[in-house]
Amino acid sequence: MNEFINFDEISRKTWQNLYNTSIAPLTHDELESIRSLNDEISLQDVEDVYLPLIHLLRLYKKNLEDMSYSKGLFLQKIVKTPPLIIGISGSVAVGKSTTARLLQLLLSRAFPKLTVDLVTTDGFLYTTNDLKNMGILDRKGFPESYDMEKLTSFLYHVKNGEKFEVPIYSHETYDILPNQSQIIDSPDILIVEGINVLQNPQNQLLYISDFYDFSIYVDADEKLIEKWYLERFDSLLKLAKYDQTNFYHQFTKMPEDKVINLAREIWARVNRVNLREYIEPTRNRAEIILHKTENHYIDKIYLKKF
């Protein structure tokens, strides 16, 4: 069966004409401040792709508010509108983080009186010591390396308007930062970004997907993602060259050809397998798929029909 049978395929040109918005445009400096390493994004992308998406999210938020109001009428009591939770998934190096930060900024502009928080699921990885003790350090990034029960608990608490402390993951140290956390306290909108956002833990009464009001999958051809991953790996090495505390510093002492081979080996052994077996199969669970081509250019959008 065609995976996209339940989606409308919309060209970028058609999509950009679906809605004209009055949201103040971003400056180039603002856009640069949220751009991830080696990601490509322009003000034209914001205007063509992301502002119509913001309008669509506005409709989903209104629908959530209307449903809460209707439930209150039925139950004859006040029902507080829960936060709108947006999930963003996709492969390593595909540009999820940039999309998440951009949406946070644009939603903050669209709803200036509301709180818009952003959390990455990296914070729910087990610590390096825990992974070693569990004997799965070489499986870091795969589903079993995440504390999915804690992630589910986090989403449950947020939906119920309760405070939650989220661990903070450092890409510099390649581990959870000890004694540091991000406090999420009753946001109006929450964006959750990570490779496992649309994955469901087994043997759970509650699925992660139950908590999302809207979900996005950032998609691209596997060969392109590999290219972007290798480029990012190279950029990370350059940043780590003079920082001995950086996880990637250890690789800066290696000959260039060996570093390239190492990056390719990590891609083939970890990231490609993870993409094929665990990430891409969740793609059709998303409400919308942003499809990228060369230079991270979004050429088409898939919107779920029902």
Swiss-Prot record:
Reactions performed catalytically: (R)-pantothenate + ATP = (R)-4'-phosphopantothenate + ADP + H(+)
EC number, as in UniProt: 2.7.1.33
GO (cellular component) term, any one: cytoplasm
Location relative to the cell: Cytoplasm
Pfam families, A to Z: PRK (PF00485)
InterPro entries: P-loop_NTPase (IPR027417), PanK (IPR004566), PRK/URK (IPR006083)
MF terms in GO: ATP binding; pantothenate kinase activity
Keywords in alphabetical order: ATP-binding, Coenzyme A biosynthesis, Cytoplasm, Kinase, Nucleotide-binding, Transferase
Binding positions for ATP per the UniProt entry: 90-97
Pathway note: Cofactor biosynthesis; coenzyme A biosynthesis; CoA from (R)-pantothenate: step 1/5
Top enzyme class: transferase
One biological process term in Gene Ontology: coenzyme A biosynthetic process
Major localization listed first in the record, in broad terms: cytoplasm
Keyword set includes Repressor: no
UniProt family annotation: Belongs to the prokaryotic pantothenate kinase family.
Cross-referenced HAMAP family: Pantothen_kinase_1 (MF_00215)
Protein name: Pantothenate kinase
Organism for this UniProt entry: Lactococcus lactis subsp. lactis (strain IL1403) (Streptococcus lactis)
